[in-house]
Design a protein with these regions (language model features):
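Alpha-helical multi-pass transmembrane bundles of energy-transducing inner-membrane proteins
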Residues: 95-102, 108-195, 209, 281-346
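Structural signature of hydrophobic alpha-helical transmembrane segments
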Residues: 1-9, 59-70, 116-129, 196-209, ...
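Predominantly late transmembrane helices and immediately cytosolic-facing juxtamembrane segments
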Residues: 214, 328-334, 397-433
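Juxtamembrane/interfacial segments at transmembrane-helix boundaries in multi-pass membrane proteins
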Residues: 48-52, 159-217, 222, 244-263, ...
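Transmembrane helix-loop-helix hairpins at membrane boundaries of multipass inner-membrane proteins
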Residues: 1-98, 467-472
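Helix-loop-helix module between adjacent transmembrane segments
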Residues: 61-118, 140, 205-206, 236, ...
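C-terminal ends of transmembrane helices
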Residues: 12-25, 73-87, 131-145, 210-225, ...
Length: 475
């Protein structure tokens, strides 16, 4: 079935690329969404059944794929280019949608990959397809962001490749057993600690470009800023999830080795530094898309603190990752409406949003509570669990600065968001303003509702999948 999914996705992408009819394009996008939903249902039913040796829908893969599919529906159906819609050529639109299809396909396959090299291959495919999306508007800013993204991602993925080679050295004479994740976990106690440490450092550093952590976070900021908002919605959620999957699968290997304590220390230091970096930039950022991008760094830092501290933090980290995906993607989609209204991404040029788009403004107000983990946001539950884990571990050296950083971030985020909602914009010409239809915000509300539901009323299946993801980790 995985081969059928991959081949069908490539056919859909190719058809979108060569087709010039708008109606057929819409039908092709709908057809791909039907394929994506069908395959998601298939892997949910066939959990842990390996296909063609290299793909296994385990609990983590299912959680990530379901999250991707839910978010892919509004992002693919969203009106992606408000301001330049009339200027877009049919070929440009086809290239955009074709790249989106390949991007979603690569994410799905990356989640499912059961071999460390196959994960690396599909992560590289996301880089290529994402670059097309970043380049979409073909102006000086998008060209610069595209080359920066390609350059930083290429270096980072070379790091991952070197890490894979070092991991093979750590296996010694057992290399012929293969590099499936299950095999590596089974062999972990006998892996050479020196080579395993080096392998982890390279793989962890390389995948931070996708996860959005220090040190390789920079390319992702520009990518989210310059890409069309639906693409940025995917970059800030499900693409970061793929980076997490790559790191987490390596983390599972080290969890069964003698270097596990050392790995947790590295993760905690990097995660706290990432939250610090996000805090610094959140205080001075003036661009709404960059503000949301730095907010993603903060949340990924919190996720990795949960992983590094262990205990209930494992469960909280997976929950935080999924809930963040829903709220952040919905926020980026709403930024499209903000840009449609104010013709700018600069916060000083926005204001009094309630006057121009009431449904969108109400959403932004609710999303503020959602993204800052203020009840009834489900992120309150995951962050509360992480704080409990830090208290139980007596990790005050992490807890105290983390709480300080989060307080500053809430203040900075609130200052900008309430300015957009209530303060009149500077030098804003109201003539010819394009109104948004309330129904266009419906998908944003549905994504926001999911974080309340999954946080406070999680279905048994959802909890079971998270528990299955972390069951082999030492509690």
């Amino acid at each position: 079935m995985i081969l059928l999914y991959l081949i069908s996705s490539i056919i859909f992408a190719s058809a979108l690329l060569i087709n010039r009819n708008a109606l057929i394009n819409k039908l092709l996008v709908l057809g791909f969404l039907v394929l994506q939903i069908s395959y998601t249902v298939f892997i949910f039913v066939h959990q842990n059944v390996t296909e063609v040796t290299y793909f296994t829908p385990d609990a983590l893969a299912i959680l990530m794929t379901v999250t991707l599919t839910i978010i892919a529906i509004p992002t693919l159906l969203h009106r992606y280019d408000y301001i330049y819609k009339e200027q877009d050529t049919p070929s440009n639109q086809g290239l955009y949608y074709g790249a989106m299809v390949i991007f979603v396909m690569a994410l799905t396959a990356g989640y499912l990959a059961s071999h460390i090299a196959v994960t690396w291959i599909f992560v590289e495919i996301t880089t290529l397809s994402a670059s097309v999306l970043i380049f979409h508007r073909r102006n000086a800013g998008s060209i610069e962001a595209t080359w920066k993204y390609i350059f930083v991602c290429s270096i980072s993925l070379v790091f991952v490749f070197i890490g894979i080679l070092l991991l093979s050295l750590a296996m010694g004479d057992q290399y012929e057993a293969g590099m499936q994740y299950d095999t590596l976990i089974r062999l972990a106690p006998s892996l050479n600690p020196f080579w395993l440490k080096l392998a982890f450092i390279f793989i962890f550093t390389g995948y931070t470009v996708k996860l959005g952590l220090v040190p390789m976070y920079t390319a992702g900021i520009d990518a989210k800023d310059k890409a069309p908002t639906p693409a940025a919605a995917l970059f800030s959620s499900v693409l970061m999830n793929l980076g997490f999957v790559g790191i987490f699968r390596m983390y599972l290997i080290t969890a069964h080795s003698s270097i596990f304590g050392w790995v947790n220390t590295i993760i905690l230091i990097t995660a706290l530094l990432s939250v610090f970096v996000a805090t610094v930039y959140m205080m001075k950022v003036k661009n709404i898309k960059r503000m949301l991008a730095y907010s993603s760094i903060e949340h990924m830092g919190i996720v990795m603190i949960g992983i590094g501290i262990g205990g209930i933090g494992y469960y909280a980290a997976i929950l935080q990752l999924i809930l963040h995906s829903f709220v952040k993607s919905s926020l980026f989609l709403q930024v499209g409406h903000l840009y449609k209204t104010f013709k700018s991404k600069e916060i000083f040029a926005m204001g009094n949003y309630f006057k121009y788009n009431t449904s969108g403004a109400v959403f932004l107000l609710l999303a503020f509570f959602g993204i800052t983990a203020i009840p009834p946001s489900g992120l309150f539950i995951s962050e509360f669990y992480i704080i409990i884990a830090l208290v139980k571990a007596h990790a005050l050296i992490i807890l105290i600065p983390l709480l300080l950083f989060l307080t500053i971030i809430i203040w900075a985020y609130g200052k900008n968001m309430f300015k957009i909602l209530f303060v009149p914009p500077m030098n804003f010409d109201q003539t010819g303003i394009e109104k948004s239809n309330p129904y266009e915000t419906l998908s944003h509300y549905l994504l926001l509702a999911l974080i309340v539901y999954l946080g406070f009323f999680p279905p048994t299946t959802f909890v079971t999948l998270i528990q299955a993801t972390i069951h082999s980790l030492p509690i």
